[in-house]
A protein has these predicted regions:
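Hydrophobic helical h-region of N-terminal Sec-dependent signal peptides
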Residues: 12-13
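C-terminal motif of bacterial Sec signal peptides marking the signal peptidase cleavage site
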Residues: 17-20
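GH16 jelly-roll
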Residues: 25-294
Length: 294
């Protein structure tokens, strides 16, 4: 081998050593980040509430009748008109066109009664049944369609001291959305906007009764609404983390500590505008659970 060939080989060996060192240096610097992520992903959770909807369990849920958001339906108890059904291992909450206008006994927070309506709907809550501080809430659910005008199904949380109907305990005296009556929306579909789309996020309190910022902490995502998905929110340190099928899609950074109170879960299917509908709309829920970190 000539001297020039020896020089070329030495140059190549030195270059390879340099690249190897830099690669090892890069891997060493990344390792703590990867370890931290894996530690969070593998963190154990323990289930302290699970409803698989083999039946409608009144130890877990109660019907709610209230008029909010200028909704055009009437919430009815006991699954009247087929608005709430448990069958084949799942809960079905519905909006039903009954075919004729009927009196409605729902009232808004100012005592105004809902006008007669031909639309009946189901709304249930774990209020005074299953209430938890922080942790993680998840529901596996789907809609019967990809979305229609006026549809407004939701899976969400509300502070346990909320002063809206039904008021059953002395400490239920805090107005929405102040601390104690805060709101976190895990899944909402606004049918007037677009199909196969939902929004998720917290409502930011503006420090007064009935004064909430609906949009600054919320984000919309595409999803196939008529297929089952798992929608969740969890408290991670001071953040609220939103997931679909276990994958993080959104995060309210630093907002978790603004919701320190016990919260209960709500499932409801609303009709939000005067747009006509026929037959029934269905939200099907396979299960609901709450977990806490061990």
């Amino acid at each position: 081998m000539t001297i020039s060939n020896y020089s070329l080989l030495s140059f190549l060996l030195i270059g390879m050593s340099f690249v190897s060192c830099k690669t090892q240096e890069k891997n060493d610097s990344m390792e703590p980040i990867e370890t931290k992520v894996n530690a969070l992903e593998n963190e154990d959770w323990e289930v302290d509430f699970l409803d698989n909807f083999e039946s409608f369990n009144t130890d877990n849920w109660q019907d709610q009748r209230i008029w909010v958001n200028n909704e055009t339906h009437c919430y009815v108890p006991g699954g009247a008109f087929g608005t709430r059904e448990v069958s084949d291992g799942s809960l079905k909450l519905k909006v039903v066109n009954t075919g004729e206008k009927r009196p409605c006994d729902n009232f808004d927070k100012n005592g105004k009664q809902h006008p007669e309506t031909q639309y009946a709907a189901g709304r249930i809550a774990t209020k005074n049944k299953k209430e938890f501080i922080k942790g993680k809430w998840t529901a596996k659910l789907k809609l019967a369609s990809n979305g229609e005008a006026s549809m407004f199904p939701a899976w969400w949380l509300l502070g346990a001291q909320n002063n809206e109907s039904p008021v059953q305990e002395p400490d239920e005296n805090i107005c929405w959305p102040l601390t104690g009556s805060g709101e976190i929306d895990i899944f909402e579909h606004h049918g007037d906007h677009q199909k196969d789309h939902f929004t998720t996020g917290a409502i930011k309190s503006l420090g007064e009764c009935d004064k909430g910022d609906w949009w600054s902490l919320r984000k919309g995502f595409d999803v196939t609404l008529n297929e089952y998905h798992e929608y969740s929110v969890e408290w991670e340190d001071s953040d609220l983390v939103y997931r679909v099928d276990g994958k993080e899609i959104y995060r309210n950074v630093g907002e978790g500590d603004n919701y320190p109170e016990k919260m209960f879960a709500i499932l409801n299917f609303a009709k939000i505008t005067d747009a006509p509908m026929k037959g029934e709309w269905v939200m099907e829920v396979d299960w609901v659970k709450h977990e806490f970190r061990k």
